[in-house]
């Protein structure tokens, strides 16, 4: 089970003739450094990760960075099938040999970020390099058939994304109607070999059986509201929203959602965001516009749908509310930090 060092964007050592040790480092040491390989060998933590994943005994599990395969074997004992992606050619070859008798395990020597999303429902599990955490999270969030993702990430990342500090990120709020984010447990850095500089944590994403906002168009409008709130120049969420919605409507919505007027946007709970949206959706007009001006933000009367049926004029979004294009018919954007 590999992870958590940063993986550089450059290429690793060539696969040609054996390289002579440099500075006392063996080829294996250099591979670990290039590929971000820190191995988790603590059996109790391995079981804790598998417990948190709560895998379907008849389902597919996709794993990234199996390393020495300890978590892979534990998952195979609990799941129907495991498909694991290993970028390190040496480890992939060894895993294929060691697991040859395990018919439920498929070892794929490839960069996980280039892997297609499975067409069938699946769960993701992995201890991943810090440097590509955001790219892997994006891969998971954009997978239509993903049911859950259990990741070992840098502890700081896990705490920020799950609201463990009492603050919430725009990514978490935007995807909240579709995904639940959970901080599971700290993983002490001393449990890895070699020992990284910071602690890790188990974080879990779970797709909700029914989205909190069931209409895809509503989720897209919700994502637009979240964007306005987080990038607005008003200083507070209240000031940002009153630039786009009537002040009286915002006052009423804040009172019913129990949000103070001076609340900083990061401290507003995602559930409060949902309430605000449900109370404000459909009343968008903006305090700065005159009483006779009902034009929407993009210059169409009432901010109504485009002739092509798309609501509003903002960027295209997937079912989870995440951007998938530039709103002008452009091609979908690749995940941040990922490979196109």
Curated annotation (Swiss-Prot):
Gene Ontology biological process terms in this record: response to antibiotic
Gly residues biased stretches: 301-314
Keyword RNA-binding: yes
One cellular-component annotation, GO: cytosol
Region (Disordered): 1-37, 284-340
Biased composition annotated in UniProt, kind: Basic and acidic residues: 315-329
Record keywords: Antibiotic resistance, Methyltransferase, RNA-binding, S-adenosyl-L-methionine, Transferase
Molecular function terms, GO-annotated: RNA binding; rRNA (adenine-N6,N6-)-dimethyltransferase activity
CDD domains registered for this protein in UniProt: AdoMet_MTases
Its EC number(s): 2.1.1.-
Broad enzyme group: transferase
InterPro entries named among the record's database cross-references: KsgA/Erm (IPR001737), rRNA_Ade_diMease-like_C (IPR023165), rRNA_Ade_Mease_Trfase_CS (IPR020596), rRNA_Ade_methylase_Trfase_N (IPR020598), SAM-dependent_MTases_sf (IPR029063)
Comp. bias intervals (Low complexity): 1-25
Pfam family, one: RrnaAD
Positions bound to S-adenosyl-L-methionine: 38, 40, 65, 86, 111, 127
Homology family: Belongs to the class I-like SAM-binding methyltransferase superfamily. rRNA adenine N(6)-methyltransferase family.
Function: Involved in erythromycin resistance.
Protein name: rRNA adenine N-6-methyltransferase
């Amino acid at each position: 089970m590999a992870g958590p060092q940063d993986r550089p964007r450059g290429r690793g050592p060539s696969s040609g003739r054996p390289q002579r040790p440099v500075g006392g480092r063996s080829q294996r040491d250099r591979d670990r450094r290039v590929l971000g390989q820190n191995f988790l060998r603590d059996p109790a933590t391995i079981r804790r990760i598998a417990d948190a994943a709560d895998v379907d005994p008849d389902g597919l599990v996709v794993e990234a960075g199996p390393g020495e395969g300890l978590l892979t074997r534990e998952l195979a004992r609990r799941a129907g099938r495991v498909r694991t992606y290993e970028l390190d050619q040496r480890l992939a070859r060894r895993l294929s040999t060691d697991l040859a008798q395990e018919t439920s395990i498929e070892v794929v020597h490839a960069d996980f970020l280039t892997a297609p999303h499975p067409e069938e429902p699946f769960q993701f599990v992995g201890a991943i390099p810090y440097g590509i955490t955001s790219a892997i999270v994006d891969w998971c969030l954009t997978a239509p058939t993903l049911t859950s993702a259990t990741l070992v990430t840098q502890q700081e990342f896990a705490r920020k994304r799950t609201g463990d500090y009492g603050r919430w990120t725009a990514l978490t709020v935007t995807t909240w109607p579709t995904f639940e984010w959970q901080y599971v447990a700290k993983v002490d850095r001393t449990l890895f070999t070699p020992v990284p500089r910071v602690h890790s944590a188990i974080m879990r994403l779970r797709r909700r059986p029914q989205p909190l906002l069931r209409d895809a168009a509503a989720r897209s409008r919700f994502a637009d509201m979240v964007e306005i709130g987080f990038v607005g120049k008003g200083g507070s969420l209240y000031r940002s929203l009153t630039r786009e919605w009537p002040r009286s409507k915002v006052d009423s919505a804040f009172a019913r959602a129990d949000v103070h007027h001076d609340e900083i946007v990061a401290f507003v709970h995602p559930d409060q965001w949902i309430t605000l949206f449900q109370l404000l959706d459909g009343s968008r007009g903006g305090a700065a516009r005159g009483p006779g001006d009902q034009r929407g933000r993009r210059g169409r009367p009432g901010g109504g749908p485009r002739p092509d049926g798309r609501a509003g004029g903002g960027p295209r979004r997937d079912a989870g509310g995440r951007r998938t294009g530039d709103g002008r018919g452009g091609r979908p954007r690749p995940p941040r930090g990922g490979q196109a």
